[in-house]
């Protein structure tokens, strides 16, 4: 089993009034980036997840443009401190599998076992992501 490190940060915000909450997610991720400094990202409905390597604060100059492009009353965000898988953009979260976007905080100890339940989920040391395995499994059950 991999060595467990500090956890990531997962943020979810939903506006009942339809207000664009993407700027609030930026603020939350920036405030909590000490929980994960490898990568960050967020997802809104009907768009691919937005992900970047590095600190949230290093992208401050882009926030206004990104917030307009991804404007939404519903957002999930994540800062990554990897416990499994390499620090690549592909492993940054949120991840999207079909219509499901997911962000996860923690380690799934039996990820290899779960990956055997979902055919076609390639689980290798290079792209090992317990979150991807969980997403694939959830999608297979829906």
Stretches found by the model and what they are:
Residues 1-142:
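Conserved short alpha-helical segments that host acidic/polar catalytic motifs at enzyme active sites
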């Amino acid at each position: 089993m991999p060595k467990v490190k500090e956890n990531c940060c997962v943020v979810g915000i939903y506006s009942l009034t339809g207000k664009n909450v993407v700027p609030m997610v930026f603020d939350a991720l920036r405030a909590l980036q000490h929980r994960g400094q490898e990568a960050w990202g967020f997802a809104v409905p009907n768009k691919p997840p937005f992900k970047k390597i590095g600190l949230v604060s290093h992208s401050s100059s882009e926030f206004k443009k990104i917030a307009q492009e991804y404007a939404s009353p519903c957002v999930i965000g994540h800062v990554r401190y990897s416990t499994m898988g390499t620090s690549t953009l592909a492993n940054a979260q949120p991840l999207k599998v079909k219509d499901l976007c997911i962000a996860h905080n923690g380690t799934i100890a039996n990820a290899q076992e779960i990956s055997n339940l979902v055919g076609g989920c390639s689980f290798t040391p290079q792209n090992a992501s317990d979150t991807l395995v969980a997403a694939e499994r959830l999608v297979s059950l829906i």
